[in-house]
Design a protein with these regions (language model features):
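N-terminal core-binding DNA-recognition domain of tyrosine site-specific recombinases/integrases
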Residues: 1-9, 20, 131-139, 152-160
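C-terminal catalytic core of tyrosine-transesterase DNA break-rejoin enzymes
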Residues: 44, 48, 52-59, 138-146, ...
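Short, P/G- and charge-enriched loop/turn segments at secondary-structure junctions
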Residues: 88-93
């Protein structure tokens, strides 16, 4: 802009090819088997909520009971959890768009209301070892793999549960703009780029 350099040194450079992981999505039958097995393992509420919202793993595990209004079904997503050298850290989500309010289906709110009676922690999904801290991302990842294997489902990453939610939402007629807001994407273009 100030013409300090006569030519752009980046002109002619080739960008590396986009390397994206193959997106995996659970089919409807797999989803049913998965949720039945998750219930048997004591993780039904965690995985049901994720499959109904498409939350990122760190967002899901950072949820506290104060984030859910049982009267309206409004769930506030305003923090995330991640691990640094074995220590859990809580921070704000990755973008401003990631801070959002979702309205849960009444059936999910009722499942969470009943589950709440069994949990003695401010965290929605506390550690099974220490109730005053949330369950760790690594523990949930390992549990996911166990449940998938026992349910006879294909092996997927936790993030693929988010893809499953998005794919099923689009198949059921949700518009891209609404889905984009639910997923916490900065723009609908991001959602379109991933899911079309």
């Amino acid at each position: 802009q100030e013409e300090l350099i006569r030519t752009n040194p980046a002109v002619g450079c080739k960008l590396p090819p986009k390397r994206g992981r193959e997106m995996q999505v659970l089919g409807r039958e797999e989803l049913q088997r998965f949720l039945i097995q998750a219930q048997a393992e004591g993780y039904y509420e965690l995985f049901l909520l994720d499959l109904c919202t498409g939350l990122r793993r760190g967002e899901l595990l950072a949820l506290q009971w104060d984030d859910l209004d049982f009267k309206t079904g409004a769930l506030t997503v305003n923090k995330q959890i991640y691990e640094v050298r074995g220590q859990l850290q809580v921070s704000v989500p990755k973008t401003r768009a990631s801070i959002r309010r979702l309205v849960l289906p009444p059936g999910v709110v009722e499942v969470l209301r009943q589950y709440r009676e069994t949990v003695d922690s401010r965290w929605m999904f506390p550690s099974p070892v220490k109730e005053d801290i949330p369950i760790t991302p690594g523990a949930v990842r390992r549990r996911l793999q166990i449940i998938l294997e026992r349910a006879g489902c294909k092996k997927i990453r936790f993030h693929d549960l988010r893809h499953t939610f998005a794919t099923l939402s689009l198949e059921n007629g949700m518009d891209v703009k609404t889905l984009s807001a639910m997923l916490g994407h900065v723009s609908a273009a991001t959602t379109l780029d991933i899911y079309t």
